[in-house]
Design a protein with these regions (language model features):
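Short N-terminal helix/helix-N-cap motif within the alpha/beta-hydrolase-1
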Residues: 132, 158, 184, 241-245
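Hydrophobic packing residues within well-ordered alpha-helices of enzyme cores
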Residues: 137, 160, 188, 243-247, ...
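Conserved acidic-Pro-Pro-aromatic motif
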Residues: 3, 122, 217-302
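Hydrophobic pocket-lining residues within nucleotide cofactor-binding pockets
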Residues: 128, 152, 179-181, 236, ...
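S-adenosyl-L-methionine
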Residues: 2-153, 158-219, 222-225, ...
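A short helix-to-beta-strand connector/capping loop
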Residues: 145, 168-172, 206, 227, ...
Length: 302
């Protein structure tokens, strides 16, 4: 499917199930056809001007059938020649709509144009989620390059591995770590969706405690030389400064390197930029969002 223009998510879901397991495709086929039969009637029965959305119908059906955390759809993206599978679950409301779908629209499109690894590069993706950057990077760097996709959240990590396998990628290594400024334990907070994770302390929310380490240590443990890294992408929902603090060896020793970082919140902008300046990085691309976040790509000055 093309992601260059807005799509109706209900129509998209009604037509996209290619690549899913036979069981999931059969379940989706049945739910889809039941919806097509009863959807128009819902307006009459419930006395509504608009019928219930297919997304809501799908979530409710999955809940009733007891398929939470086990039902997958696959989105085919011929424009970029890769696929993404997505977990559809009532326990993570609107994961498919708010995160995966939104990420495949123009919000990320112009950023990816400037995120440009070349053949043979080594890319480190911190906060890889389901592979939105890691999978295209795999094709950009080719068989002589490598991509290390680091994801802290266990559920995201499982979807990431599934997507790497779905696209038959052999140059992507998936790592289940939380990246931080020191070796410690951190809480991954999940707020409404599986993608909305924040590494912060002092908030009383539902959270998963996971082991964390510095990016320098993680790469060393996986036999990745700091000097070899060409691209780092960071999207960690507010912990980007802590990630950079734990990457001293990489930032000091890698000469041919660029960093793409999504800075969450206006208060985090200056500290992140100041740290990049300290290591002699120059901003080559910046995009500011209305909600206060910024996307920055910076390259090391030789």
């Amino acid at each position: 499917m093309s992601i260059s223009s807005p799509l109706n998510i209900d129509n998209l879901l009604l037509n996209e199930a290619k690549g899913a397991s036979v069981k999931d495709r059969l379940v989706f086929f049945c739910i889809k056809n039941i919806y097509r039969s009863v959807g128009p009637l819902s307006m009459i029965i419930l006395r509504r001007r608009r019928r219930i959305s297919f997304m809501g119908f799908l979530y409710k059906s999955i809940e009733i059938l007891g398929l939470d955390n086990s039902f997958f759809l696959v989105f085919n993206m011929p424009k970029y020649d890769y696929k993404f599978c997505s977990l559809v679950t009532r326990k993570i409301p609107n994961f498919l709509v708010q995160d995966m779908y939104a990420s495949m629209t123009s919000h990320e499109e112009d950023v990816r144009k400037h995120f440009s690894p070349k053949k043979g590069d080594i890319v480190v993706d911190v906060g890889a989620a389901f592979g939105l950057y890691a999978i295209p990077s795999s094709k950009q760097v080719g068989q002589n390059g490598k991509v290390f996709a680091i994801e802290a959240h266990p559920d995201n990590y499982e979807v990431l591995k599934r997507n790497v396998k779905l696209n038959n990628l052999t140059n992507v290594t998936c790592l289940n770590y939380a990246v931080y400024s020191t070796k410690t334990k951190v809480k991954i907070y999940t707020n409404y969706t599986i993608m909305s994770e924040r590494v912060i302390s002092g908030e009383e929310e539902k959270a998963k405690e996971v082991n964390a380490d510095t990016l320098d240590n993680i790469l060393e443990q996986n036999k990745i030389s700091a000097e070899q890294v060409n691209w780092i992408k960071i999207d960690v929902e507010g912990a980007e400064l802590e990630v950079l603090k734990g990457a001293h060896n990489i930032l000091s020793n890698s000469k041919d390197i660029a960093i793409s970082v999504e800075i969450h919140g206006k208060n985090n902008y200056e500290p992140v930029i100041d740290l990049l300046n300290l290591y002699n990085f120059k901003i080559i691309f910046q995009k500011n969002y209305d909600w206060g976040d910024s996307q920055v790509i910076a390259r090391h000055l030789i």
